[in-house]
């Protein structure tokens, strides 16, 4: 529908698809409108990472933009990165638990970084799903290059003043 609009060049597309977010950002969508191909790219996203690992999200987004602007295809390491980001988002947002632990998952990462004292939610029944804390530990250990823990530690005192 966006590609068929006369205002398509004024419309920015964003993705919140945590199952495939890096690939969404890398993809140039080509849709036939009448007899002409119209191309449109998603210009932003990485919602899971923006919630807890913002510095890493910026770095990922810059890599994605550089690859997309080069226009020479998608390097294998970007597909590996895509799978890693998807794995991390699954740990935080809890699709295995029907997304019941989404807010608590974000809070848990922020608590581990020292930015929150606990993972309390407005609804006291909203908490981590069974095994979710272990999943968060697993992904932060498996992909230390995608977390901001050292950066947060370096600035925590300054930010909490």
What do the predicted segments below correspond to?
Residues 106:
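Conserved, mostly hydrophobic/aromatic
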Residues 97-100, 109-161:
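Long, low-complexity C-terminal extensions of enzymes
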Residues 1-102:
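Catalytic alpha/beta core domains of metabolic enzymes, predominantly
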């Amino acid at each position: 529908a966006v590609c068929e609009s006369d205002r398509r060049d004024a419309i920015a597309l964003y993705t919140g698809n945590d199952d495939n977010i890096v690939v969404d950002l890398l993809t140039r969508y080509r849709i036939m409108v009448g007899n002409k191909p119209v191309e449109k790219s998603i210009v932003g996203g990485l919602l899971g990472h923006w919630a807890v690992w913002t510095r890493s999200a910026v770095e990922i987004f810059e890599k994605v933009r550089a690859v997309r602007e080069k226009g020479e295809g998608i390097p294998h390491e970007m597909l590996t990165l895509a799978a890693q980001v998807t794995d991390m988002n699954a740990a935080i947002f809890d699709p295995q638990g029907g997304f019941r632990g989404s807010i608590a998952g974000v809070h848990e990462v922020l608590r581990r970084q020292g930015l929150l004292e606990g993972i309390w939610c407005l609804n006291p029944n909203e908490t981590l799903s069974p095994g979710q804390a272990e999943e968060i530990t697993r992904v932060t250990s498996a992909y230390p290059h995608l977390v901001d823990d050292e950066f947060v530690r370096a600035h925590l005192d300054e930010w909490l003043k």
